[in-house]
């Protein structure tokens, strides 16, 4: 179910599996076991569903049976923007574990349905190539990789695998709640995949190949939490660089926002993200308004940190080293 090259890659890394006890991550758990790939697991309890207690218990049971380390986080209550805040909490939790335990790869169980949902959301917002090409199988971070081994498999493929082998898994009913925007696209993507996955996989391969050209137009020179500093080859690549970076941070750029970026070097996107160009350096960070002491302001000015970026640096005590 996963490629030989992917198996070799996973065997060359110290792996942490993002686990939820749902269909996708349960399938990946047992696929890794069947291929004798070493890994440990991490799970987040958001405390929103009674079933979550059973899922945590099952994760502990699996860790005990198969001699895996398990890391558990209890998320705080999020009063608004649950999906974005939950994602930020989850990936920060994974990152901390990775840094503290010297893991070199984070494994996530995203599959083809997820990838198609992302594409449909992008189309509905007038998105460009970076969003439409979707999730990548391998994303290289500062000191680890994110690897998604199941991107060419459908949800039905994974269900068939689990049911045939009689492996236990849970169904998260919140995935059907339409108050979450992404869930509205799920029935559409599921019905489209009934026509077969080969054509969709081929189209995604082509999109990814074409997007590689644009990825070579910039490089990340500094990264900390939700701050990125990119070095651009040319101003014309700014909209793509912003789009690609914000996609990694969980925000899909709209067509209107892309148009604005063609002509503006300093902007706040969606009232959340500050984007500022200084020479050939592009700064992207969460937009935070705070009172900054005069002496610290001067330090930022001397360090050439753009004004809209300073609030995030100050609130997170980040010293940008370029």
Feature-to-residue mapping (PLM):
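ATP-dependent adenylation/nucleotidyltransferase module used to activate substrates
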Residues: 1-120, 156-157, 164
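AMP-forming adenylation/ATP pyrophosphatase catalytic core
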Residues: 6-13, 139-140, 205-322
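Proline- and acidic/polar-enriched loop/turn elements at helix boundaries
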Residues: 44, 75, 151, 173-175, ...
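Glycine-rich loops and low-complexity Gly/Arg-rich segments
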Residues: 65-69, 94-98, 130-134, 194-196, ...
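Short, solvent-exposed polar/charged micro-motifs at secondary-structure junctions
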Residues: 80-84, 181-183, 265-266
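Short, charged, solvent-exposed linker or helix-capping segments at domain edges/interfaces
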Residues: 83, 195-198, 293-298
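Flexible helical/loop "lid" subdomain adjacent to adenine-nucleotide binding pockets
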Residues: 113-250
């Amino acid at each position: 179910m996963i490629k030989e090259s992917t198996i070799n890659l996973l065997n060359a890394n110290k792996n942490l599996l993002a686990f939820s006890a749902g269909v996708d991550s349960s399938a990946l758990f047992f696929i890794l076991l069947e291929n004798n790939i070493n890994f440990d697991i991490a799970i987040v309890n958001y405390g929103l569903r009674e079933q979550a207690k059973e899922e945590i218990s099952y994760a502990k049971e699996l860790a005990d049976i198969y001699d895996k380390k398990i890391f558990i986080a209890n998320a705080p209550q999020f009063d608004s923007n649950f999906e974005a805040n939950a994602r930020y909490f989850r990936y920060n939790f994974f990152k901390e574990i990775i840094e503290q335990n010297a893991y070199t790869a984070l494994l996530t169980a995203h599959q083809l349905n997820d990838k198609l949902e992302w594409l449909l959301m992008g189309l509905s917002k007038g998105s460009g190539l970076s969003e439409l090409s979707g999730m990548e199988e391998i994303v290289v971070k500062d000191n680890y990789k994110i690897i998604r081994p199941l991107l060419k498999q459908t949800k039905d493929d994974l269900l068939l695998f689990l049911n045939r082998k009689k492996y236990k898994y849970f169904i998260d009913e919140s995935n059907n709640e339409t108050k979450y925007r992404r869930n509205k696209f799920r029935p559409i993507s599921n019905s489209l995949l009934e026509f077969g996955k080969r054509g969709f996989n081929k189209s995604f391969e082509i999109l990814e190949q074409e997007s590689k050209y644009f990825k070579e137009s910039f490089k990340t020179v500094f990264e900390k939490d939700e701050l990125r500093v990119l070095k651009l080859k040319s101003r014309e690549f700014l909209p793509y660089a912003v789009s690609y970076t914000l996609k990694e941070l969980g925000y899909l750029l709209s067509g209107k926002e892309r148009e604005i970026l063609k002509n503006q070097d300093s902007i706040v996107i969606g009232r959340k993200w500050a984007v500022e160009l200084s020479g050939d350096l592009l700064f992207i960070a969460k937009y935070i308004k705070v009172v900054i002491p005069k002496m610290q302001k001067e330090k930022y000015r001397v360090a050439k940190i753009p004004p809209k970026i300073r609030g995030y640096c100050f609130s997170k005590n980040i010293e940008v080293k370029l």
